[in-house]
């Protein structure tokens, strides 16, 4: 079996595994009493992650360079990053809710790469001279990982907005939160409650999260779900933002070496800056201004669209130094 055939098998396998895993998580959300579905879903994401890693490794061997130079390769690297971010978030939360949100994103990315892209865009080609640099791995890989983590965090924020739709919910406590499902803390009824500090492990004091709502009814289960989604969304975005910052700085250094200018207001650079500003505003609002609940979630949810425009929209327009030029 040659490497090209192996790549074709692996990309289709990763799509199939992610599709089945998505269905497992959705069934698990509908029937939470079934004990083994969450473990099965986590195993499915891990298998998909390994399949994509093997695909990228085979591509690296075949082409002789780090496989992130065209749209097909970057999409699968992005899918790998989303599955990796899922596993991190799953470890943080111990909740099946993460998979309900993240597996459709990863599955959609792999489906677009494996089933939609033209065959000529799925084949490897020699690198253009400008890409023959160690900065290719250092800059692009970090940017793609930041996109993956920010997408996951933003998708969880969208899920939070869906769960709290029509409710004036505000979560009070630390910015990190406690997570009702994750720690087993039973949230209070939707009315103002006095916060009490409890001592956590590692000499870190945390606050029991309480919820204030003007709405007449929001079940304790939905409050716990909302708390978990808000908590993990914040943590994952907090991981992705430094990666985005490092990636932009690395890109500026590479641009100066290649073209003699740190910043040229290329469409990709402009949208990367917009993305950075959106998530900087989100973190500033939560950490400095103390925003909680739906307001920061709306800001994070808008970041989901901004990241996709930055990554895919600008590229497919065929404009600028970062374009893949498929549609136009």
Curated annotation (Swiss-Prot):
Top-rank taxon: Bacteria
Coiled coil: none
Pfam families: Cytochrom_C_asm (PF01578)
Species annotation: Gloeothece citriformis (strain PCC 7424) (Cyanothece sp. (strain PCC 7424))
Cell compartment(s), UniProt: Cellular thylakoid membrane
Principal place of residence: membrane
Alphabetical UniProt keywords: Cytochrome c-type biogenesis, Membrane, Thylakoid, Transmembrane, Transmembrane helix
Protein name listed in UniProt: Cytochrome c biogenesis protein CcsA
Disulphide-bridged cysteine pairs: none
């Amino acid at each position: 079996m040659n490497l090209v055939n192996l790549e074709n098998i692996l990309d289709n396998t990763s799509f199939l595994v992610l599709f089945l895993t998505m269905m497992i998580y959705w069934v698990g959300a509908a029937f939470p009493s079934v004990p083994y579905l969450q473990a099965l879903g986590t195993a499915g994401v891990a298998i998909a992650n390994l399949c994509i890693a093997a695909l990228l490794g085979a591509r690296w061997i075949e082409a002789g360079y780090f496989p992130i130079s065209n749209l097909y390769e970057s999409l699968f690297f992005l899918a790998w990053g989303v599955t990796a971010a899922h596993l991190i978030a799953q470890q943080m939360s111990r909740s099946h809710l993460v998979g309900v949100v993240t597996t459709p994103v990863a599955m959609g990315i792999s489906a677009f790469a494996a089933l939609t892209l033209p065959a000529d865009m799925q084949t490897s080609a020699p690198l253009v001279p400008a890409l023959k640099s160690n900065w290719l791995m250092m800059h692009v890989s970090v940017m793609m990982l930041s996109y993956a983590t920010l997408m996951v965090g933003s998708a969880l924020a969208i899920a939070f907005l869906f769960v709290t739709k029509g409710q004036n919910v505000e979560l009070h406590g630390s910015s990190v939160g406690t997570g009702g499902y994750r720690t087993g803390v039973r949230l209070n009824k939707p009315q103002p409650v006095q916060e009490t500090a409890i001592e956590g492990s590692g000499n870190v004091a945390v606050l029991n999260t309480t919820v204030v709502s003007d709405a007449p009814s929001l079940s304790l289960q939905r409050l716990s779900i909302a708390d978990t989604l808000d908590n993990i969304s914040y943590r994952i975005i907090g991981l992705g933002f430094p990666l985005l910052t490092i990636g932009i700085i690395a890109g500026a250094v590479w641009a100066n070496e290649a073209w003699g200018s740190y910043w040229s207001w290329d469409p990709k650079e402009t949208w990367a800056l917009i993305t950075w500003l959106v998530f900087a505003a989100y973190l500033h609002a939560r950490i400095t201004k103390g925003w909680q609940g739906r307001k920061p979630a709306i800001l994070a949810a808008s970041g989901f669209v901004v990241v996709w425009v930055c990554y895919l929209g600008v590229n497919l327009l065929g404009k600028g130094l970062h374009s893949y030029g498929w549609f136009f």
